[in-house]
């Protein structure tokens, strides 16, 4: 009953496991007058447009990774900037993978993203927080979150959220070093600090907005992109020096 009431009010509910990491997500299936139109356009998305959208997403992801390295003073990000400029339609050369190998060794030397360690715990929790609000924004905009642009796993109900989270990941990455501790088990303080990523400011079309606001704008812009068959309609966040809008949160 409690979860149903939350869903009626548009609240995304994260269900936590024993390790305090999100294990499941309940998102509201809010009635939306344009849902049928958006869903039809999403299902009929041409492959070439999907490839263009994915290239734009990955390009911005790598650019934000470069910005994160520069903001954290973790080295020379010029190689990442160069890689961002080589992304082709559909990321056919897997520039994303090349950039990831370089980026994570600069961000946290010795990091293995497959390991269960303190730094990965921080990243994974922060990503899950952003993924949840992004999934909500996509559903309320009329999208079927299981139908991705690039991700197409039949076992993943949130392929589209996993596509669009990519440029947002650096927002978590840039605050992670100040939150990580010696334990892979996150405490209440760490979880609270990671949830605050939603009030972190980013640039959207030259305007400072919170991550929480940015995910709504990304979802709305994707509606225009699939409706008009125009990749340039998609708006994506640009990472800036971390600052938080506590007034919006309160």
Where are these regions (language model features)?
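Active-site helix-to-loop segments that bind/position phosphate- or nucleotide-bearing substrates
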Residues: 8, 21-250
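An N-terminal domain-cap segment
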Residues: 1-4
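Short hydrophobic alpha-helical runs that function as membrane-insertion/retention elements
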Residues: 11-17, 21
């Amino acid at each position: 009953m409690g979860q149903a009431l939350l869903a009626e009010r548009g609240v995304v509910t994260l269900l936590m496991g024993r390790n305090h990491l999100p294990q499941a997500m309940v998102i509201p299936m809010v009635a939306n007058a344009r849902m049928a139109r958006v869903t039809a356009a999403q299902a009929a998305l041409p492959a070439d447009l999907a490839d263009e959208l994915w290239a734009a997403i990955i390009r911005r992801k790598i650019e934000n990774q470069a910005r994160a390295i520069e903001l954290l003073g973790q080295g020379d990000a010029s190689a990442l900037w160069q890689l961002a400029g080589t992304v082709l339609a559909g990321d056919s050369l897997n520039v994303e993978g090349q950039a990831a190998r370089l980026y994570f060794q600069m961000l946290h030397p010795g990091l293995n993203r497959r390991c269960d360690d303190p730094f990965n715990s921080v990243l994974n929790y922060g990503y899950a927080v952003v993924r949840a609000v992004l999934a909500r924004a996509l559903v309320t905009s009329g999208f079927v979150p299981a139908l991705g642009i690039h991700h197409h796993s039949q076992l993943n109900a949130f392929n589209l959220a996993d596509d669009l989270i990519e440029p947002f990941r650096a927002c978590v990455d840039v605050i992670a070093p100040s939150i990580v501790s010696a334990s892979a088990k996150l405490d209440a303080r760490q979880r609270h600090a990671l949830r605050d990523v939603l009030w972190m400011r980013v640039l959207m079309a030259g305007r400072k907005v919170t991550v929480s606001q940015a995910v709504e704008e990304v979802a709305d812009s994707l509606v225009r992109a699939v409706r008009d068959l125009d990749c340039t309609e998609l708006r994506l966040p640009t990472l800036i020096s971390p600052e938080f809008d506590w007034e919006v949160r309160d």
